Swiss-Prot record:
CDD domains according to UniProt: IF2_eIF5B (cd01887), IF2_mtIF2_II (cd03702), mtIF2_IVc (cd03692)
Gene expressing this chain: infB
The protein's name: Translation initiation factor IF-2
Organism field: Syntrophus aciditrophicus (strain SB)
NCBIfam families listed in its UniProt record: IF-2 (TIGR00487), small_GTP (TIGR00231)
Keywords of this entry: Cytoplasm, GTP-binding, Initiation factor, Nucleotide-binding, Protein biosynthesis
Annotated HAMAP family: IF_2_B
Stretches the record annotates as G1: 429-436
GO CC entries: cytosol
Basic and acidic residues bias locations: 93-107, 158-171, 194-203, 256-279
Length: 919
């Protein structure tokens, strides 16, 4: 049994492989692909089912698309008429067409007319019969037909129909309306397979059925031209006619075949009675062909029609030539004015800005470069730069609205809820003037004895009870490195106690503390300390402070002065009374019922408890379990301790408290606010974190072309440092102090700084960035020390800030290139010249002062002008080579590479001495 592949059967049926596979699956025939094989029984089953359902599906599909429907309308009528016309002609003329003609006509390869059923041109090798009909025997010669030449077709002069056809009384079918043309197939028996292309016959001026109004139909041929000059293809009409009359061919449809849905007429069309009889069809076809002279679109006689089809191009090619598709240029859509506004925060990346404006990032970068600003697609630019760039693209930039602001935490308290609170007093002054000792005397403690170097290096908050009243003291460092701490203390305090040593006088940090207090608008009480010393002179101190507008009350001013001795406990009670008196004048009050608000005084990372911060509550009451936010950090109060280390449940206004529960170590001087829940706290913290990140990106990426060139030209060296400190305030002080050591030749860069112990991450970062690690009041564990030694990372540990600054300064000086200084050794006068073969000119010289050495450099000076700078080639005394010649002796001096010596020249001997540079 022969087998047939799926694609072969699909080609015979004129449908796609996918469609045939789908039909096979519906019939229960399993195939894997288009190259699968089918048995003969399966082939018969598929073909029967195809012809039983194919026409119905084709009609349903043709109704959906008008162009396809027009093709289907003319197929049955054309084929039926072409089948009958040769038979009538054979009877009249007594001569049948040659049998060889259909064998020589090539089938037309044209676009299939439908999607559901795609008919294929008549293939001579095999004809698929209709459903319920036995297949006829194939022709003896199944070879591929070849189209005959046009000249051979023209020789058949009697192929034109006789005039008798025009005399038959068929008037209605003479002019076929477009609507009636669709119903014409009813008179023709059902056919197994429609031909692929049909000719549209219509009157000029009438629209094609189904075509949209307003579209001009493409003309096939000008009305006045019988034979178009266009080249063309296969003679389709001739093929249809001769194939229909050729003997031995399979007839497309027998009388007994069932009618398909394609042959059913539309309801609004009434066909003439003549169409019910098959014998009337030839006369109708003949009438259609003979009506040509009355219609402007008629093709002429059959012979002319054959010639025209032979030389005319296909309709689809004609349409392409007649109506070429014009490619439209891409139109740039311009948004409306209301949409040409973008919202930008404090910083935005170049890519995000380009996306908001709907332009390419490269165009934005090009604009930035023209402005002299170097930036990549991922770098950030500030709001001003973004505004300038957006203006270039005709966009308006609006600042993005703040989601959160400090003002949202400000709550107006009613006067009834305000209650008196304790004053906050900050002790300020120069280093080693006795600030902490004075506070120890007040608190009756010994804090000074436990401080490294006897100096305060962190801000502290304490609460003192005096005669039933409380005073909160803030102790600030006096060292020059702790300027930020002193400024922070002045901003949160009510009263400043300025401590000045009676034996030392007004110093730099004393003046700085005065300025901080004036900026904060805080009243100042001057405490003259160390009056117990013999060299103490309080009057001199008062006189010096008048230069800074601090005039004692006894001198007619408004500044309170108090003389104390912290070591001898002299004048402590009087000082406290003056503080309370000043507090009464200020009438300090706060609302304890509102949500807590305060400021972070100090923060550190505790190994066992995590981030810990000293917070001074200014308003409201903070309870254990409250959610809070401090700028970028947030959390929930897990525990609170007072200044004595005791656990407390709540803290009211003017209370220093140690808070545990931060997400990270907060920034010193940051605001502290209690919120409704932790979710809101997290949202606010994340928002401020994004804002800080935008600022950092904007600051790091903002570099102009000029700055880039200068930086490359300078070749500045950098010393990278990683800082670790016990508390946040000390970390800030260290960072500021070290950064100030930078010069034009060497820069110190703090690449990372945090609180807590030195970790492995710090060591790996230092190794990658070639940095040193400085630990202040912290130490690494054994494991970290081993890793640092293996990586070659230098870890420096300190507990006094003086030593940190001194060592870092020395390290920076070691990176500086040394300077070279000329040191003149002596001078010699040329008094005679000697010409020595193979050596050159030797100057007979007399050493005037100093000495001339063999390895020294020399300068030849003539008339006060340096003529040559080089080295001594030879130094002789008489005939002996010597290392040096002292003043008052004669010698012979030869200079390397120079012989133009003259009498009276001066020879200066010198050396370049290396001098280490200092910062």
């Amino acid at each position: 049994m022969s087998k047939k592949r799926v694609y072969e059967l699909a080609r015979e049926l004129g449908i796609d492989n996918k469609e045939l596979i789908s039909r096979l699956e519906k019939l229960g025939i399993a195939v894997k692909s288009h190259s699968g094989t089918l048995e003969d029984s399966e082939v018969d089953r598929v073909t029967k089912e195809f012809h039983a359902r194919g026409s119905r599906e084709m009609v349903e599909q043709r109704i959906k698309t008008t162009v396809i429907r027009r093709r289907a309308v003319r197929v049955p009528e054309k084929e039926a008429v072409l089948e009958k016309v040769p038979v009538e002609m054979e009877k009249e003329m007594g001569k049948a067409l040659p049998e060889e003609v259909p064998e020589k006509i090539a089938p037309s390869r044209e676009t299939p007319p439908a999607k559901v059923v795609k008919p294929r041109p008549v293939v001579p090798e095999k004809k698929i019969p209709a459903a319920g009909e036995k297949p006829l025997a194939p022709p003896e010669k199944p070879a591929e037909p070849v189209a005959p030449p046009i000249a051979e077709i023209l020789k058949q002069e009697k192929i034109q129909p006789p005039e008798k056809f025009a005399e038959e009384p068929l008037k209605k079918p003479a002019v076929i309306e477009p609507e009636k043309a669709a119903a014409a197939p009813k008179a023709v028996p059902g056919e197994a397979k429609p031909l692929p292309r049909t000719e549209r016959v219509q009157e000029q001026g009438k629209p094609v059925p189904g075509r949209k109004e307003g579209r001009t139909p493409v003309s096939r041929r000008p009305a006045e031209t019988r034979f178009p000059a266009k080249p063309a293809p296969q003679p389709e009409m001739a093929r249809k006619q001769v194939v229909a009359a050729a003997p031995g061919r399979a007839v497309p449809q027998e009388k007994g075949a069932p009618k398909t849905e394609a042959e059913k007429p539309r309801k609004k069309i009434k066909l003439p009675d003549e169409t019910r009889k098959g014998e009337q069809i030839p006369a109708r076809k003949k009438t259609v062909l003979k009506k040509g002279p009355e219609k402007t679109d008629f093709r002429g006689t059959l012979e002319e029609e054959i010639i025209e089809r032979a030389v005319r191009p296909p309709r689809w090619k004609e349409e392409k030539k007649a109506a070429p598709v014009k490619m439209k240029k891409t139109e740039i859509t311009v948004p409306k004015a209301i949409k040409r506004r973008i919202r930008v925060g404090e910083a935005i990346t170049v890519g995000d800005l380009a996306k908001k404006m709907g332009v390419k990032a490269g165009e934005v970068i090009n604009k930035l470069m023209r402005m002299g600003l170097m930036a990549t697609i991922n770098q950030s630019i500030d709001f001003d730069a973004a505004s300038l760039i957006a203006t270039e693209f005709e966009y308006q930039v609006e600042p993005a609205g703040m989601e959160y602001d400090e003002s949202m935490f400000k709550v107006e308290s009613s006067v009834e809820n305000l209650k008196p609170r304790a004053p906050v007093v900050t002790i300020m002054g120069h280093v080693d003037h006795g600030k902490t000792s004075l506070l120890d005397a007040i608190r009756k403690t010994r804090v000074t004895e436990g401080e490294a170097g006897g100096i305060t290096q962190a801000i502290g908050a304490y609460r003192v009870n005096l005669k039933g009243r409380e005073i909160v003291f803030l102790d600030t460092p006096g060292h020059e490195a702790f300027t930020a701490m002193r400024a922070r203390g002045a901003q949160v305090t009510d009263i400043v106690v300025l401590v000045v040593a009676a034996d030392d006088g007004v110093m730099d940090q004393t003046v700085e503390a005065i300025n901080h207090s004036k900026i904060a608008g805080v009243p100042i009480i001057v405490a003259i300390n160390k009056i117990d010393k013999p060299e103490a002179d309080p009057g001199r101190i008062k006189q010096a402070l008048t230069e800074y507008e601090l005039v004692p009350e006894e001198w007619g001013g408004d500044t309170i002065f108090s003389e104390v001795s912290a070591k001898q406990k002299i004048g402590i009670e009087e000082l406290l009374e003056l503080i309370l008196l000043q507090a009464d004048v200020l009438e300090l009050k706060a609302d304890p019922d509102r949500p807590a608000r305060g400021v972070v005084i100090e923060a550190r990372l505790d190994r066992g408890r995590g981030p810990v911060a000293t917070v001074l509550i200014q308003e409201g009451t903070l309870h254990e379990g409250d959610a809070f936010v401090s700028k970028t950090e947030y959390g929930r109060v897990r525990a609170m301790n007072d200044d004595q280390g005791r656990r407390i449940k709540e803290a009211g206004p003017a209370t220093p408290v140690e808070v545990i529960g931060f997400s990270r170590v907060p920034q010193a001087s940051a605001e502290f606010n209690a919120v409704e829940d932790e979710k809101k706290a997290r949202s606010i913290g994340d928002y401020w974190m994004r804002k800080e990140r935008e600022k950092e990106l904007s600051a790091t990426s903002k570099i102009t072309l000029e700055q880039l060139y200068e930086k490359m030209k300078e070749g500045v060296k950098e010393l990278n440092v990683i800082l670790r400190a016990d508390v946040q305030g000390s970390l800030e002080a260290l960072s500021d102090a070290l950064t100030k050591l930078s010069t034009d030749d060497i820069k110190l860069k703090v690449i990372h700084g945090s609180t807590g112990a030195i970790t492995e991450t710090d060591v790996m970062l230092a190794s990658a960035s070639n940095a040193i690690i400085i630990g202040f009041n912290v130490r690494p564990d054994a494991r970290v020390a081993e890793i640092a030694e293996a990586e070659g990372v230098d870890i420096k540990l300190y507990d006094i800030i003086y030593n940190v600054i001194a060592d870092v300064r020395a390290a920076m000086e070691g990176l500086l290139e040394p300077e070279y200084r000329e040191v003149v050794l002596g001078r010699a006068e040329v008094r005679d010249l000697f010409r020595v073969p193979k050596v050159g000119t030797v100057a007979g010289s007399f050493v005037i002062d100093g000495k001339v050495t063999r390895k020294a450099n020399v300068k030849l000076v003539r008339d006060g002008v340096v003529v040559f700078d080089g080295k001594i080639g030879s130094l002789k005394r008489f005939k002996d080579d010597v290392k040096e010649v002292l003043s008052g002796f004669e010698c012979g001096i030869g200079i390397e590479g120079f012989n133009d010596l003259r009498m009276g020249d001066m020879i200066e001997a010198y050396i370049n001495e290396k001098v280490e540079r200092k910062l």
